Amino acid sequence: MALTTFSISRGGFVGALPQEGHFAPAAAELSLHKLQSRPHKARRRSSSSISASLSTEREAAEYHSQRPPTPLLDTVNYPIHMKNLSLKELQQLADELRSDVIFHVSKTGGHLGSSLGVVELTVALHYVFNTPQDKILWDVGHQSYPHKILTGRRDKMPTMRQTNGLSGFTKRSESEYDSFGTGHSSTTISAALGMAVGRDLKGGKNNVVAVIGDGAMTAGQAYEAMNNAGYLDSDMIVILNDNKQVSLPTATLDGPAPPVGALSSALSKLQSSRPLRELREVAKGVTKQIGGSVHELAAKVDEYARGMISGSGSTLFEELGLYYIGPVDGHNIDDLITILREVKSTKTTGPVLIHVVTEKGRGYPYAERAADKYHGVAKFDPATGKQFKSPAKTLSYTNYFAEALIAEAEQDNRVVAIHAAMGGGTGLNYFLRRFPNRCFDVGIAEQHAVTFAAGLACEGLKPFCAIYSSFLQRGYDQVVHDVDLQKLPVRFAMDRAGLVGADGPTHCGAFDVTYMACLPNMVVMAPSDEAELCHMVATAAAIDDRPSCFRYPRGNGIGVPLPPNYKGVPLEVGKGRVLLEGERVALLGYGSAVQYCLAAASLVERHGLKVTVADARFCKPLDQTLIRRLASSHEVLLTVEEGSIGGFGSHVAQFMALDGLLDGKLKWRPLVLPDRYIDHGSPADQLAEAGLTPSHIAATVFNVLGQAREALAIMTVPNA
């Protein structure tokens, strides 16, 4: 029996480092409608025609320091313009597309490695399928830059992730080619299945394709979706983009983090299971010719081959009802097109999963050799790979959190840390280096992370669960049912709270105060600076009779003195502090907004009024004594927070209303994020759009006091 074989070949720039490990050729099968068999081809390089002419890595890198010529890509504005290209031209298009991605991301920053890894796959998908009628969904969206370039947005790539520019993810309102908005992981199989079922109910015939990475496959939603897809049996295609990056490699310290979970092991076995393929082909051949008990025996041989040779990999997908094809070289356009065409032409087969193996950072040597594969980058010099990061006088809040947690763990061996595939993003890679047996990466699985932490708390440990504010939303039921209801002392470190700049609304931490402070047993706090963060880490460690959480922003500290060795001192729970004493007006800030209040106080003072500024520290429990004092001794009270409605200000208003503090002449105004999503942009632009700049706060003070002239002066000349 002739078998079509696929193998990964190194390509890209001359001088790229050899890939670790080995990808063994394996048969990609389609028993439902067999691929046309062809003789096994010699292993070949798919190096770009451009790179092949460059004799050194330096020449190849310098080639990208200026915008490289892209004569073929210049003729392709939309996928329709690709349809008549030859295979050789498609490869050239991929080479030029990769160069264009490198050039643009070097100017804007963004998610480079993921996009470089799917260039050939993107070309093949848009060549075979008729988008936008056919739907292609890109999970997470990190890898969508080549897709954007090929779908009418190349001229807007210089605006990527900037105010009023292109989103760094797929976005339905941006293009009809973006079938589904993304930013968080593991959603596309669910959405694609919904689209496929909706198509069937309407009698449509279009194709639906979900592209999902091996990292996203660690989330439970992906398996829930596959389970339902197998049951509903609607025609759809799932492409598993396997680049061995199950844990997001954000700013790793000691080289690439090993992929997390059993899935990684299963996929690795699938990549080297040629005996499995041959046994399965034999078994299928037998089952077509015989029946009865012998037929059942042959089927068992097939199942035995899967279990003994490949582990649970293909068994898992096929037991869920998805027809498995692969593994396939994700950088071989010829093979990709052949398989995609065959799957597209074969209808009424139900869901199909194509296992595609790619290399993150493909074709750019600095990305290929980097520990994080240049997952997310700032602007950089393509010729050297050096990123243009402004030197900072202080560390990031993320790093201060990590240092403070290490300080606690040094003194208490019950302190453990959990993150969801974000060791670099949460700073816990530093904790891992110091305490390798007390740091747990659970993969992209926030729901599991929360309940896993709850189990640790049941055993008397002190778990700190570090998760981005917007990502913790996925584990909210677990926070309620598994932690707060049982009053288990899990500590939630909510990173990226508030506005996050270029990553936009999908990553904005707007809602955490609202959804955490409504829980009866939760202690909710937020630091106003990096020293306060150290103290709140210590406070959380000391709270051992109930759950607690603290939020902190993206960005760097403000430069205040720090406690020795980052070891904080536990705060009195539910007690705030007054930072400035003034009259008539009190600004009660929460978290990072305290700094905006201090700056606003300076603006107001230039107009002859000195205001009081207080740091609430806690949203739950509130410092009722402090609020009574501020409300009774001032004409105006402003609560200021970088969070949504229903948060800190709402809790203050609830207390004041019940306490009768709003029955007199006090004027209370809440300053919060607007009740809408704020698009990506610079932090300064986002803060201005939200109306939370010091100028906005100062102007609000004078507007409430009836001094419109002063308010107008501040907004007209903000620093006046």
Swiss-Prot record:
The EC number(s) this enzyme carries: 2.2.1.7
A family per Pfam: Transketolase_C
UniProtKB keywords: Chloroplast, Isoprene biosynthesis, Magnesium, Metal-binding, Plastid, Thiamine biosynthesis, Thiamine pyrophosphate, Transferase, Transit peptide
Compositional bias of kind Basic residues: 35-46
Sites where the protein binds Mg(2+): 214, 243
Binding site for thiamine diphosphate: 142, 183-185, 215-216, 243, 364, 446
GO CC annotations, alphabetized: chloroplast; chloroplast stroma
Locations listed in the record: Plastid, Chloroplast stroma
Alphabetical list of SMART domains matching this protein: Transket_pyr
Catalytic activities: D-glyceraldehyde 3-phosphate + pyruvate + H(+) = 1-deoxy-D-xylulose 5-phosphate + CO2
GO biological process, one term: glyceraldehyde-3-phosphate metabolic process
Subunit (UniProt): Homodimer.
Record protein name field: 1-deoxy-D-xylulose-5-phosphate synthase 1, chloroplastic
Organism: Oryza sativa subsp. japonica
